[in-house]
Amino acid sequence: MPKPKEYVLKKSEEIEGTKVEGPWLDDTKSLEEVVSLYTQIGFQATHLGKAIEIWRKIEEKREKGEEIRVFLGYTSNIVSSGLREIIAWLVKHRKVDVIVTTAGGVEEDFIKALKPFILGDWIVNDAELRKKGINRIGNIFVPNDRYIEFEKYMIPFFERILEIEREKGRPLTASEFIYELGRFMDEKLGKEKEKSIIYWAYRNEIPIFCPAITDGSIGDMLYFFKEERRDRELIIDIANDIVKLNNLAVTAKETASIILGGSLPKHAIINANLFRGGSDYAIYITTAVPWDGSLSGAPPSEGVSWGKIRAKADYVEIWADATLVFPILVWMVMKR
């Protein structure tokens, strides 16, 4: 005879742990106090709370003089958004040591120092936008004159790179190319360059790696430059950057991998850390899912299986739009 009550009201064991509880707003006086209680809320708030704790631990150790080399990776859409300025602040204040991004993460940073991107909408007539020469990145609009202006700067910059390569007798690596682009910004652009990632990376000698440097408008400009001039001299060396990036991981006492999004920057960083037995700390912020087997969706624990993150590493993954959580994360760590 079934005993419904025993099934429904099954006895449970007592468990120890953190009580799930949110902030009581009568007792909180600031948003900072609210966020400080995120670890107890549950779901992704708890993951954000843990990310704050991990990065604070990293910062506290660095402030004491301990060596933790911080690798920051992000995709181009991060720079398309207003997160660009937050990353530029981190670079200005030397809160990161190594950057890996995509071509868009380089060129859009430069373009924004010329003209801004404009807030639009998600639901629009894209065919009409095309007629008007307006490109769309989600709800961000990029008029095509931004790229026309970009070309005006890139052609003389390519000429400069050619001269440097002739003087050195070898191609520049992508990271050297980006360093020279920062120098070029310093010489040619005005006050707006002071919110640029590339500019501050140049000033503080923080390397920016971009293994897919031609996969964007820079590649378009290189195509026009080479075709119109029948140039075969200008070459960007990717191979030697692999040595430099990997050695930055190998020679570090400890490393931290902070990844916004997925794609190439994520793998370039964690694969470099494989050469030292894995990263000691990792913070992933992503909306990618793990069940399609993609690298973008692979959680930190999967990286442990490859040796790219250490088994005893302190890590967390936040499943959220980075534009929502990264500003909170940085503020809570750097402005506490």
Curated annotation (Swiss-Prot):
GO cellular component: cytoplasm
EC number(s) from the headed UniProt entry: 2.5.1.46
Keyword Transferase annotated: yes
Catalytic activity, reaction form: [eIF5A protein]-L-lysine + spermidine = [eIF5A protein]-deoxyhypusine + propane-1,3-diamine
InterPro entries from the UniProt entry: Deoxyhypus_synthase_arc (IPR022899), Deoxyhypusine_synthase (IPR002773), Deoxyhypusine_synthase_sf (IPR036982), DHS-like_NAD/FAD-binding_dom (IPR029035)
Superkingdom in the source lineage: Archaea
Family affiliation: Belongs to the deoxyhypusine synthase family.
Name this polypeptide is given: Probable deoxyhypusine synthase
Cofactor(s) this protein cannot do without: NAD(+)
Gene: dys
